[in-house]
Amino acid sequence: DACFMGALEVGKEGNINAHRGPGAFAGIGGFANITAKTPTVVFCLSFNAKGLEVTQKKGVVTIEKEGSVPKFVNKVKSVSFSAKRAISNGQKVLYVTERCVFRLTPKGLKLIEVYPGIDIQKDILSQLLFEVEI
């Protein structure tokens, strides 16, 4: 079984904030229950927010304009999903963006896929606020 969930922020350890946005606080609902008990959790989110413009032609992704608000941060504002708990529970966790895919490991995030047209240094690594395993 798998679940597909959104996320506001991803922390360097793999923790997720899915309920506390800038200047607002929303209830978490069933998010914690679903993500804690599902063997495979896939978080789907844009790499950056606010102004991001992406095109895709013939399987090639192009970042036309970068977003100004990072979604991959050193520490999330609030923990909706615990990466440490997911690792101890043996869950498979993926973070899917418009440009790449990361997998949760005991060391943190590992970059496992980069889409055609994406420059790994310019479009991914230089946009991160922390280092990831490659």
Where are these regions (language model features)?
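Conserved phosphate- and dinucleotide-binding cores of soluble alpha/beta proteins
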Residues: 1-134
